[in-house]
Amino acid sequence: MFAPVSRIVRSAALFLFGATAASLVASAAQTSAPPATAPAAMHDVTDEMGRTLRIPVNPTRIISLAPSLTETVYALGAEDRLVGDTNYCDYPPDAQKKPKVGGVIDPSLEQIASLHPDLVLVTKDANRLETVRALENFHIPAYATSPHKVADIIASTEKLADVLNIPAAGKIVAADLEDRLAALQSRLSGLPARRVLFVVWTEPLISVGKATFVADALGKAGAVSVVDSAQDWPQISMEEVAHLQPDYLVFAPSHSDVAQRDFDGLANLPGWRILNAVREHHYAIISDAVIRPAPRIVSAIEELARQLHPEAFAEPPAEEKKRPSDKAAAWFEFPDFLPSTRSNDARTAGELLCNR
């Protein structure tokens, strides 16, 4: 039976792109006033959508409305300020213990207001404009990020550190990520890029467009997507894939107990079995961190590079030999795979954005 494979791919794909969700109907209820304190010093910041917000100089009660932003807050060491996040914020494991405010596309304004945040973090690609406007109506500032490339993710991390008034942490994290990417490019220098198909969904077959940060991450790993589409999440036919004949199929399941053998069922399916990559079992299976615009994406890039170009990792390059083993930001390099807290059952299309 190939059903388990479909569930594996579907589980990862549910987090990538969204259908139109129902209108936000939650309204904030009366909540008890927070304890009286001295007024916080305020200043203006500009988010990545060009919006000017007035926020505390030192935000201390933060709510994250996206898993990627929750991970970034932890990477910066500011998790003690995180007073709430979404049902999908599952990493690092401690994030699951934070008070929940609902989903990514349908958070509860009542629950958000009850936590008295002085800053809410949102991302343009996953959260809804209606949510941001509703927060504004309740005078709750919402800082938005909008990364499109891996470099943008690193820059967003550093900007968020500035917003949280911990610029040194942002510089440490950004420098570590940049150093690791530079070392990786040194390893891959001169090697031909592997032509890959990043599989988001099998039925229908959906991949990633050339303008997404996922496609950029593939490039950093010594790969190039065979899908040259301006759409972010294009649907493609098996006939087109058969014509393109990728060297590897890349999967990013959301749980750790997945191995190449779990994809062997592809060889029994019409359309798939005519692909050279399927016949040769050329599958790259990496962490779903690759679909989260957060610092951990670099770990997923490194893992993909190891699978596509094992010959490049026989000997560490000179710059890696010189790097100290106790790099200041190394603490946030999480394992390659995420433990899943969800079942393998199919989800609705409205949940597809939720793991971003």
Located regions from the model:
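His/Asp/Glu-enriched short active-site or ligand-binding loop at hydrolase and phosphoryl-transfer sites
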Residues: 86, 211-234, 253
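Signal peptide processing junction and immediate N-terminal pro/mature segment
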Residues: 23-36
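Extracytoplasmic substrate-binding proteins
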Residues: 51-52, 118-119, 129-206, 224-229, ...
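N-terminal secretory signal peptides that target proteins for export/translocation
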Residues: 1-7
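Short secondary-structure boundary segments
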Residues: 66, 124-125, 200, 230-233, ...
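A short, structured surface patch at a secondary-structure boundary
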Residues: 42, 61-126, 229, 272
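Bacterial N-terminal signal peptides
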Residues: 11-23
